[in-house]
């Protein structure tokens, strides 16, 4: 008990010192700066690009600034599992390319650092472990599809972000943001608050200005929820719009890779870089046909709410009332008190069939992923379970268990029970959100936080979260806009217009 008290008060003192230092840095000339004209605090992709072009900043210097910020704050936040040993080399290459080429013709992400959730594979010196020691030292065959596109855009891979271990699919008892490798991620606004997950580190890193932009993954809520809890923008694309090849999977039917950034425009620029056909992910073939010519940045318009029909579909708190007024003021037609049939069944997860299907899909998908690894200490879900039992203390099995793993391992493929579950989800989607949107001619549905993530998840629908405020204790919350498959253009218009009309986001203060 004495040791615990000493640790607690020592940690608190460190937090207070770091917090005060960061607050002072944000509000004064003592900010972390390269020069008197550039700061990484809240810097957007456009800010960085302009600084590059004006010779006020190099990519190498930018990477150094982010690495410095990580070294100072990551011992408290546990947002980054590891940084890339080659990040500075990549940045130097980008700087040389910028000197040799017409900068106006370089991709907008050229030389910009990106952090990846630790379930997204990279064929380099970085590990890809889903936060588990079971995969430490494994070697992937190739970059994930989205990473390949990032490299082609000239982005610098800064490192791997922490996450809820195995994307929160080892045990539902594991706290959001915890993994054996990454430890417990902290919410930068209120350190004792839930950072959410499973893309916790991606959201924490971005909101704490440890990186410019990041990528997360979502099966059900894992982008939208941490984005909401950490006052950042998260885009969960329609399933298939971004490749899942090379990503530690849960369900190819529901998994989606998307941006987590501080602004809608940054998220859209990152989305533009990662969408497209990948022969290693069959779902991208059909989805790529819906990518608009010229990309998604053309939908970044401040008039994006004008004439949009938006539906409020769940009982909402007074926190949303103010924003409903804003939406209407900006020209949207807001229809209140709408109902999605069987919403309680969908949100519940078990009765909808989602959990039944995910368990079987996870075992099949993970086994396939592990077998494709060039080198790995584990080759199947059964191997991972055995590893956790052997190294139970390291993986905190006694504390958190692995009941989801065990239940998934007991499945035997897509049997009648699983097929019935899949059919039920299709019917719930068809008779639920699809019918609601079509009958009311809606452009999007609206909710606080990620309350409708399961509605979007089971149908492969897209969603965007935008910062919407802070509660009385300083904990952030967001507003989410969801729509039918491939309705990203409308959702981006709505989200960007809302963001620009409110400009609610503010940097964290690290309240202990």
UniProtKB/Swiss-Prot annotation:
Protein name, entry field? Probable amidase At4g34880
Tissues where this protein is expressed: Expressed in vasculature of roots, cotyledons, leaves and sepals.
Family recorded in the similarity comment: Belongs to the amidase family.
User: What does the record give as the reaction this protein catalyses?
Assistant: a monocarboxylic acid amide + H2O = a monocarboxylate + NH4(+)
What Gene Ontology terms describe what this protein does at the molecular function level?
amidase activity
Enzyme Commission number: 3.5.1.4
Query: What Pfam families does the record tag this protein with?
Result: Amidase
* Originating organism: Arabidopsis thaliana (Mouse-ear cress)
Listed A to Z, the keywords are:
Hydrolase
């Amino acid at each position: 008990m004495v040791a615990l008290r000493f640790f607690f008060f020592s940690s608190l003192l460190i937090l207070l010192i770091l917090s005060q230092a960061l607050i002072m840095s944000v509000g004064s000339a003592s900010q972390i700066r390269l020069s008197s004209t550039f700061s990484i605090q809240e810097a957007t992709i456009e800010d960085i690009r302009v600084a590059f072009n004006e010779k006020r900043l190099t990519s190498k210097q930018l990477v150094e600034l982010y690495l410095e910020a990580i070294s100072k704050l990551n011992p408290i936040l546990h947002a980054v599992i590891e940084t890339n040993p080659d990040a500075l080399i990549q940045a130097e290459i980008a700087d040389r390319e910028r000197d040799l080429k017409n900068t106006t013709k370089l991709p907008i992400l050229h030389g910009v650092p990106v952090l990846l959730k630790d379930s997204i594979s990279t064929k380099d010196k970085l590990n890809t472990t889903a936060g588990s020691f079971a995969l430490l030292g494994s070697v992937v065959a190739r970059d994930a599809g989205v990473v390949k596109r990032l490299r082609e855009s000239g982005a610098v891979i800064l490192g791997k972000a922490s996450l809820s271990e195995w994307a929160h699919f080892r045990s539902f008892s594991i706290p959001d943001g915890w993994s054996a490798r990454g430890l417990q991620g902290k919410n930068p606004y209120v350190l004792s608050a839930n950072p959410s997950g499973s893309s916790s580190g991606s959201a924490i890193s971005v909101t704490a200005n440890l990186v410019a932009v990041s990528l997360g993954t979502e099966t059900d809520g894992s982008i939208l929820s941490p984005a909401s809890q950490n006052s950042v923008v998260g885009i969960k694309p329609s399933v298939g719009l971004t490749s899942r090849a090379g990503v530690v999977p849960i369900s190819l039917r529901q998994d989606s890779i998307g941006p987590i950034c501080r602004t809608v425009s940054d998220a859209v620029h990152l989305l533009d870089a990662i969408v497209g056909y990948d022969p290693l992910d069959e779902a991208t073939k059909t989805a790529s046909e819906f990518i608009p010519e010229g990309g998604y940045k053309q939908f970044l318009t401040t008039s994006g709410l004008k004439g949009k029909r938006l539906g409020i579909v769940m009982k909402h708190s007074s926190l949303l009332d103010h924003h409903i007024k804003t939406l209407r003021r900006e020209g949207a037609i807001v229809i209140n008190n709408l109902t999605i049939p069987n919403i309680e069944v969908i949100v519940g997860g078990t009765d909808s069939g989602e959990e039944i299907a995910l368990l079987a899909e996870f075992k099949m998908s993970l086994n396939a992923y592990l077998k494709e690894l060039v080198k790995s200490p584990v080759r199947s879900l059964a191997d991972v379970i055995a590893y956790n039992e052997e190294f139970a203390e390291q993986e905190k099995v006694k504390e958190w268990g692995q009941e989801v793993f065990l239940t998934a391992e007991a499945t035997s493929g897509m049997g009648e029970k699983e097929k019935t579950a899949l059919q039920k989800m299709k019917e719930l989607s068809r008779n639920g959100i699809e019918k609601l949107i079509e009958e009311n001619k809606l452009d999007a549905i609206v909710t606080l936080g990620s309350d409708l993530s399961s509605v979007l998840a089971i149908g492969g629908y897209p969603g965007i979260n935008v910062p919407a405020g802070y509660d009385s204790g300083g904990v952030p919350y967001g507003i989410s806009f969801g729509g039918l498959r491939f309705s990203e253009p409308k959702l981006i218009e709505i989200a960007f217009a809302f963001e620009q009309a409110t400009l609610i986001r503010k940097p964290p203060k690290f309240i202990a």
